């Protein structure tokens, strides 16, 4: 059963063509800008305001071989001591695996999880090196295929199971771009116990790179998903949330969608002006509850 709390918000239209882009990529960039990335503040380093100590944790940068034999870089952290630990895959925003994402992994490790954040854009460039969000979207994000992302996440899950993670307790959380991936992975991997999607896009145009969106996959979900959204996020209109809720309810899927009335997009991102401490803290608590209620 799906539950949702929401309030009406006004949608915003963006028309930001990128000269010279092939149509499929142009559609993707327009969709992405309309999904709130145009409002994103490009971080200098993604330096998290919240600084989580690594005392009592083991952490480091690792490489995980993908299905195409590319060694994908990832940040890994878990409690010191003997496992196996439940694993949470952490899926980045469009800005990559910067310090905020790493700190989020450490926060999870302090709760007893093994956390892994793979660099899912690695094959296409460094997000932090792009001069504008628009160029980041067209030159990197538009080149990333959902199929490759899902395959890379599978590789991370396999690595985790062989390196201190409990193969029977796998979860995932994602932010912004990664929030959409959270819904997709819950429809893709039957071994996933639970997922939490933070303000992930629910609708979009179909393309070879992104053939399906969460609203298309409500019936296909194989794991319970918690969606956390901002009531003042101009990028994800209430109609999209309602459509997702309706699809989940019709399919009889176990899911919950929470909308924070005064929050905008990226309300958990503590390095950005959009950060809302109270809502972020509440969402974090709900996420941990969701994981534990579903065997993680």
Show which residues each predicted segment covers.
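N-terminal secretory signal peptides
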Residues: 1-23
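N-terminal cap/lid segment of alpha/beta-hydrolase-fold proteins
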Residues: 47-81
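Short beta-strand element of the alpha/beta-hydrolase
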Residues: 84-93
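Short amphipathic alpha-helix adjacent to the substrate-entry channel of hydrolases
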Residues: 99-123
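Primarily recognizes the serine-hydrolase "nucleophile elbow" in alpha/beta-hydrolase
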Residues: 154-220
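Short beta-strand/loop motif that positions the catalytic acidic residue
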Residues: 221, 227-229
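C-terminal catalytic histidine-bearing segment of alpha/beta-hydrolase fold enzymes
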Residues: 249-296
């Amino acid at each position: 059963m799906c539950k949702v709390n929401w309030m009406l918000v006004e949608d915003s239209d963006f028309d930001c063509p990128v000269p010279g882009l092939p149509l499929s990529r142009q559609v993707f960039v327009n969709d992405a800008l309309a999904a709130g990335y145009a409002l994103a503040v490009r971080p200098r380093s993604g330096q998290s305001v919240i600084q989580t100590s690594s005392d009592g944790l083991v952490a480091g940068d690792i490489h995980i071989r993908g299905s195409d034999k590319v060694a994908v870089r990832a940040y890994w952290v878990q409690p010191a001591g003997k496992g196996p630990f439940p694993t949470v895959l952490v899926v980045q925003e469009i800005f990559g695996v910067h310090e905020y994402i790493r700190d989020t992994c450490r926060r999870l490790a302090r709760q007893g999880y093994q956390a892994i954040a793979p660099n899912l854009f690695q094959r296409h460039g460094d997000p932090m090196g792009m001069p504008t969000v628009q160029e980041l979207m067209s030159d990197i994000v538009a080149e990333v295929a959902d199929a490759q992302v899902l395959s890379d996440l599978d590789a991370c899950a396999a690595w985790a199971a062989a390196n201190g993670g409990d193969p029977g307790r796998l979860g995932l959380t994602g932010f912004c771009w990664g929030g959409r991936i959270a819904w997709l992975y819950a429809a893709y991997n039957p071994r996933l116990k639970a997922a939490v999607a933070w303000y992930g896009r629910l609708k979009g145009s179909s393309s070879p790179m992104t053939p399906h969106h969460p609203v298309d996959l409500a019936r296909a979900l194989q794991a319970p998903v918690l969606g956390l959204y901002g009531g003042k996020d101009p990028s994800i209109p209430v109609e999209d949330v309602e459509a997702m809720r309706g699809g989940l309810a019709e399919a009889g899927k176990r899911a919950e969608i929470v909308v924070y009335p005064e929050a905008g997009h990226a309300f958990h991102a503590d390095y950005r002006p959009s950060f809302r401490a109270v809502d972020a803290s509440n969402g974090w608590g709900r996420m941990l509850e969701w994981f534990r209620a579903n065997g993680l």
